[in-house]
């Protein structure tokens, strides 16, 4: 991007935003003059600069998401949380001073027990309920996933076992058929008729009988 184009973009943005852009540009120009600019500008400011210079909506969404994330971090317990000062006790009104001591004792006991247990804070109760519900939902989801995965694994195992048994039975039948073919070919006399000596003749009952060559060979007559 040339400097002339950059100046044109600056003028366009300045005319559109008015006085807000003047303050923003002055702060950006002061930061851009610094040699270690990338160490000064954080991600949110860089996203805002890119949003104004290039007009990318994604950068604007990034800055908004970062702001939302910062607000969520502020709401987390233990991070910038204003804890109430339990040491400072409120002084009762004169109308409350007229009450008897017997009416004050159960209130103090209940307050102390409730503050120790933390039952009076509705935010903590809601957080605990949400945490319990989320943990129970996660455990239920995990159990469902394990159940579905176990069912799928069992189905795959049974399918593979059935395919293995089927292949074994097919191979057994194939080998048995080949064995039967070979035994039938070996035992059948018709297959050995051409290889048998000419002085033997096959009978109708598949038995062999010896004959003379003069009786079988017409050339001998």
Swiss-Prot record:
Bias-annotated ranges (Polar residues): 84-101, 183-193, 207-221
| Disordered: region residues | 75-149, 183-221
The annotated regions of Basic and acidic residues compositional bias extend over: 116-133
Q: Which cysteines are joined by disulfide bonds?
A: none
Function per UniProt: Does not belong to rhabdoviridae replication core genes, and is specific to sigma virus: protein C is presumably involved in host-virus interactions.
Name the UniProt record assigns to this protein: Protein C
């Amino acid at each position: 991007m040339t400097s002339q184009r950059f100046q044109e973009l600056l003028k366009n943005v300045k005319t559109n935003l008015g006085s807000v852009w003047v303050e923003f540009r002055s702060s950006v120009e002061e930061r851009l003059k610094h040699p270690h600019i990338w160490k000064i500008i954080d991600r949110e400011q860089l996203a805002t600069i890119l949003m104004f210079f290039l007009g990318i909506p994604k950068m604007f969404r990034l800055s908004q998401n970062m702001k939302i994330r910062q607000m969520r971090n502020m709401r987390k317990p233990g991070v910038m949380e204003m804890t109430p000062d339990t040491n400072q006790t409120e002084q009762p009104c004169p109308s409350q001073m007229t009450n008897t001591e017997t009416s004050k004792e159960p209130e103090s006991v209940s307050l102390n027990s409730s503050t120790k247990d933390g039952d009076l804070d509705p935010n903590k109760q809601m957080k605990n309920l949400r945490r319990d519900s989320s943990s129970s939902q996660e455990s239920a989801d995990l159990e469902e996933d394990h159940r579905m995965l176990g069912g799928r694994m069992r189905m795959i195992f049974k399918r593979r076992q059935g395919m293995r048994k089927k292949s074994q039975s097919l191979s057994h039948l194939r080998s048995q058929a080949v064995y039967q073919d070979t035994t039938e070919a070996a035992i059948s006399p018709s297959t050995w008729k051409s290889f048998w000596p000419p002085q033997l003749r096959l009978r109708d009952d598949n038995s062999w009988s010896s004959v003379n060559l003069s009786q079988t060979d017409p050339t001998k007559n």
